Regions:
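The feature captures the beta-strand-to-loop junction immediately N-terminal to the Walker
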Residues: 27-29
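Helix-to-loop junction immediately C-terminal to a conserved catalytic motif
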Residues: 42
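Conserved ABC transporter NBD signature motif
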Residues: 50-66
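Conserved ABC ATPase "signature" region
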Residues: 88, 99-115
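Catalytic Walker B motif of ABC-type/P-loop ATPase nucleotide-binding domains
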Residues: 143-147
Length: 202
């Protein structure tokens, strides 16, 4: 798979096999294409050449045949809604989870579902945890997490890491991009480096 924008090469000859029940780590400097790779794997951007397929159990699936949860760095939710209202609004689109399940995931990530505080009033760490929550709440086949523990305190880091591990045990394909070397070493089964347009297993 390759990706170019106009005449600028972003990713070249990327060839990955991603299987369910595993966590894959991606490391690289800013500007090397990590976020673009995740956008392609999420189906948000089309590759210039090639395709994306996932292995769910023993079955090969095209990108449009799998459910995906995406956390892109600097993503934002609805500023005038509370934590519960944000997740409930997003959940109403696919109707895959109940209000009780939304409350449960909020509790587990350190939120009070009854708190009416607006998202715009949250700290950066709280915003980050809520964006993570929306990525995993519907238990998707594929979870793409760009800097999932960025801006979190120690408690928040542990809450997020534990939930990532649980999603792996459930059988999800999980991809983590992080500058936090501890995240990568603790969580990931395989690690890839993105450098000079290439994605290489290390």
């Amino acid at each position: 798979m390759c990706k170019s924008i106009h005449t600028n090469l972003i990713l070249d000859d990327v060839n990955l096999e991603l299987h369910s029940g595993a966590i894959y780590g991606f490391i690289g400097q800013n500007g090397t294409g990590k976020t673009m790779l995740f956008r392609i794997m999420a189906g948000l951007v089309r590759p210039s050449e090639g395709w994306v397929k996932y292995y769910i159990g023993d079955n090969e699936r095209n990108i449009g045949e799998v459910s995906k949860g995406v956390m892109i760095e600097n993503a934002e939710l609805y500023p005038e809604l509370s934590a519960f209202e944000n997740l409930d609004c997003l959940a109403s689109i696919n109707k895959k989870i109940s209000k009780r399940e939304i409350k449960e995931i909020l509790y587990r990530l350190g939120f009070d579902p009854k708190d009416h505080k607006k998202y715009s009033k949250y700290s950066l760490g709280m915003r980050h945890r809520l964006v993570f929550a929306q990525a995993v709440m519907e238990k998707p086949d594929v979870i793409l997490l760009d800097e999932p523990t960025n801006a979190l305190d120690e408690e928040g880091v542990n809450l997020v890491r534990n939930m990532i591990k649980e999603e792996k045990d459930r059988g999800a394909i999980i991809c983590v991009s992080s500058h936090n070397k501890e995240d990568i070493s603790i969580l990931c089964d395989e690690i890839f480096s993105i450098y000079d347009y290439k994605v290489t297993k290390i």
